[in-house]
A protein has these predicted regions:
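Polysaccharide-binding and catalytic clefts of secreted carbohydrate-active enzymes
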Residues: 1-115, 122, 126-132
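Hydrophobic targeting/anchoring helices
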Residues: 92-198
């Protein structure tokens, strides 16, 4: 998020990562367009300022890494709290590995779950099956030879994409078989029909 708490946590994350503001300035290339900072208190969260604006790519990448680390820490805290009550239960969480959504460092996440699991949704167009194979190959590599699951796989259209195309006849079966052929040990469906809201 973009709250003061997130800003302060991002500044601390940057300080731990770089040690000195000079190291951060060098890594982000802040000499360009006079972006140099004099202290970590000057670090800001990257913000989109309009169609012609530019966000420092090093700053943006580090903010993505920061977000990954914060979410992973939150997952581990939840997992550990539940494990105290249910120590014999396996733990996982839904990855979102696809060619248009993979902004998390799932190699780090894979070490923290008992088995990896993915949400995979239909990509309309000719490249859909190629995208499915690419996503599943990445999941299979993250699983390191252990079972992995497709936690969410739609039967047809969803309600949350800008354009919500329906699957054609046979595509749900084809995609399910393709996931299994690529190594998935379980296929779960969500949702049977697109929600009316949300």
């Amino acid at each position: 998020d973009y709250s003061d708490n997130a800003l302060n946590a991002f500044r601390l994350w940057c300080e731990r990562k770089y040690g000195t503001i000079e190291n951060l300035n060098k890594a982000w290339g802040t000499t360009f367009w006079g972006q140099e900072m004099n202290g970590f208190h000057e670090v800001l969260i990257p913000r989109f300022m309009g169609a012609d604006s530019m966000v420092n790519p090093g700053q943006k990448l580090d903010f993505e890494r920061f977000g990954n680390d914060m979410l992973l820490d939150f997952y581990k805290a939840e997992r550990d709290a539940i494990a105290e009550i249910c120590p014999d239960k396996p733990f996982t969480t839904n990855f979102m590995v696809s060619t248009d959504q993979c902004c998390m460092d799932y190699a780090d996440w894979a070490e923290e779950v008992d088995f990896v699991s993915n949400d995979h949704y239909f990509h309309e167009g000719e490249s859909h099956i190629d995208e499915l194979f690419c996503s599943d190959a990445l999941m299979d590599s993250l699983a390191l030879g252990k079972p992995w699951y497709v936690m969410e796989h739609s039967t047809s259209a969803v309600q949350w994409k800008p354009l919500n195309a329906r699957k054609r006849k046979g595509e749900t079966v084809r995609d399910s078989i393709a996931h299994v052929a690529m190594g998935a040990d379980a296929i779960n469906f969500f949702q049977w029909r697109a929600s009316a809201f949300g």
